[in-house]
Amino acid sequence: MSGNQTLDIKNKEFMLVGGLLIVVAGLMAFFPSLNDSDTSVDWISIPLVGFPIIVSAILLAFASQEKRARKEIIAAPIRLFTLCASLIPLAISTSLFFDWLILVDWDLSYNEYALQKKYIWIESIGASWHVGMDGLSFPMVWLTTFLVPVTIVMTWNEKNGATYFPLLLMMGGALIGVFVALDIFLFYVFWELTLIPMFFLILKWGGKDRRYAAQKFFIYTFCASVIMLLGLITLYFLQPEGNGAQYGTVTGRTFDMTVLFSNATAYNMGDNVFLGKDMQNILFAMLMLGFLVKLPAVPFHTWLPDAHVQAPTGGSMLLAGVMLKMGAYGMLRIPIAIFPDALVFYQDVIMAIGLISLVWGAVVCLGQTNLKRMVAYSSVSHMGVILLGIASMQPIGYAAALFMMFAHGIISPMLFAVCGAFKHHYHSMEIGDMRGMARWLSLIHISEPTRLGMI
């Protein structure tokens, strides 16, 4: 490819990104504000969660009916339609995010939810479609809606796009569902839903060892999710039967996080402990195990380097940018909020795991010759920093952990995008194969201050 052709492609990409920013800015004028007087509109269930998942499911069903030759023809319109569909959640979340920054002033309280909506789902067990956003979920929701269209643009020429791009969109919708769910049953449904598109992204568009990496990713995360599910079911059956009675549940129990948090706070007053100290410690350990594998933290991290090395660029961007944050988010949302006494009991253990992850990830990172594996191990180190902030049990530590989650969610996908560019140019991820970069990649040095944390 000649220099003029490369420059022409770059100009088209810059024009496309600039046009997207203009479209998003225009759409923001039509979407909600946190201080709107009309709260009857559900701005979360359909626009942020349901719309991406439904659209992606329709596109996947449509593409699966077409023959292979036909799929290459319909890939271009599906790619463009997927990009346009991803801009609507971005415009909505951007409008809400900036309002939240101004009005809430980074309030990280667990009981101040905006745009909260609740619908009875499975009345017999007390499960509901309950969604809302607070200071913990707002940054993660915006980060997800931002990264999905960016990932689509950065992998614009990916092969088999008729199914690839809808999977990215479905992944985004499932991730948003995790961050806005205020019902434990709903939370777990979206938690498991995120596994499906990522598994197929690695399996179908990955490298030569993609089957091994996809199976390892699925086995690790699914087994951890099963242990977490057992903990959630135990929590459901051990809670006082009057927990959900006032909400019309048949069993008298509930999956509602806000109710569980309120009751746990009330029980923990004085010498009382919600469910008892021993049971708190057991349930806390079961839930934390599931979240530590997803984070991931040492020694549960071995699935991550293989997944990143074999995953396509788009899969790595969403995996590093948002999917890893599900672990830290889940810790703060469920076990730490409901079982604070258990956090005190396990504080030293969690801090030790965080410190080991920080140091081990950094040391192993320095010895890697594969560029994507190097970035993957750096993510393990960064997740250790997040775990240390959580284990501090201080408001400033929680705020620092959330800031690190957000910052890593921006920087890490960009690093994997650069890795994808290197692979496209050198057809290799081995650092020893990358020579002669000074002439055509000199502008990358501009990014060094941000990578080193100097700005």
Spell out what each predicted region is.
Residues 1-50, 54-154, 162-166, 246-254, ...:
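Transmembrane helix-loop-helix hairpins at membrane boundaries of multipass inner-membrane proteins
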Residues 55-79, 198-215, 424-427:
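Cytoplasmic juxtamembrane interface segments
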Residues 79-82, 141, 165-168, 188-189, ...:
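Hydrophobic/aromatic positions within or immediately flanking transmembrane alpha-helices
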Residues 130, 179, 188:
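Hydrophobic "anchor" residues on beta-strands that sit immediately upstream
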Residues 150-156, 173-185, 199-447, 451:
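Hydrophobic transmembrane alpha-helices and their helix-loop junctions in integral membrane proteins
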